[in-house]
């Protein structure tokens, strides 16, 4: 099983507002940059989209070390998801889960891809080269969204 390190980030100018996502993937023999943007979106949606697009770009099951600077994504996947599903996509306060469309896509992708994922939190804007690279790509995605107006 190939080992892949992934760094993801989301950015938003206004929340909601134009946003972008970026992902930097690296393995022993290759690197890949992914980015995109949307107009009326939120930072959390862009953080999630970055993870979805990065995992979807992998063509076969991999051992993934996934670095995110979003506690929302990290805790959603490692702490909250099972409870949300058990409650029919409701929070502990019985409210609908926000961004349920993306949570369901991410859950489906993780559970059917065959990837083994080690979720890791990295402090954003703190000099981590992989995170800084993903941040640059996310900002490129914002620029792309703004050009599409």
Swiss-Prot record:
Enzyme class (EC, first level): hydrolase
Residue stretches making up the RNase H type-1 domain: 1-143
Binding site for Mg(2+) 2: 9, 135
Subunit organization: Monomer.
Chief site of localization: cytoplasm
Binding positions (Mg(2+) 1): 9, 47, 69
Localization: Cytoplasm
Protein name: Ribonuclease H
Cofactor: Mg(2+)
Function per UniProt: Endonuclease that specifically degrades the RNA of RNA-DNA hybrids.
One annotated GO biological process: DNA replication, removal of RNA primer
Gene: rnhA
Family, as annotated: Belongs to the RNase H family.
Lineage: Bacteria, Pseudomonadati, Pseudomonadota, Betaproteobacteria, Burkholderiales
UniProt entry keywords in alphabetical sequence: Cytoplasm, Endonuclease, Hydrolase, Magnesium, Metal-binding, Nuclease
Cellular component per GO, a single term: cytoplasm
Organism: Albidiferax ferrireducens (strain ATCC BAA-621 / DSM 15236 / T118) (Rhodoferax ferrireducens)
EC number of this enzyme: 3.1.26.4
GO MF annotations, alphabetized: magnesium ion binding; nucleic acid binding; RNA-DNA hybrid ribonuclease activity
Co-factor binding details: Binds 1 Mg(2+) ion per subunit. May bind a second metal ion at a regulatory site, or after substrate binding.
Stored InterPro entries: RNase_H, RNaseH-like_sf, RNaseH_domain, RNaseH_sf, RNaseHI
Catalytic activity, as annotated: Endonucleolytic cleavage to 5'-phosphomonoester
């Amino acid at each position: 099983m190939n080992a892949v390190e992934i760094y993801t980030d989301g950015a938003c100018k206004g929340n909601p507002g134009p946003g972008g996502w970026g992902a930097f993937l690296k393995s022993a023999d290759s690197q890949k940059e992914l980015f995109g943007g949307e107009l009326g979106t939120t930072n959390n949606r862009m953080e999630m989209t970055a993870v979805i697009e990065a995992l979807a770009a992998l063509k076969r099951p991999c051992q993934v070390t996934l670095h995110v600077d979003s506690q929302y994504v990290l805790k959603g996947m490692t702490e909250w998801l099972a409870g949300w599903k058990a409650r029919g996509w409701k929070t502990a306060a019985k409210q609908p889960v926000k961004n349920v469309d993306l949570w369901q896509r991410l859950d489906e992708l993780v559970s059917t891809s065959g990837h083994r994922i080690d979720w890791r939190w990295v402090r954003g804007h703190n000099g981590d080269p992989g995170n800084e690279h993903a941040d640059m790509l996310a900002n490129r995605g914002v620029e792309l969204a703004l050009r599409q107006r």
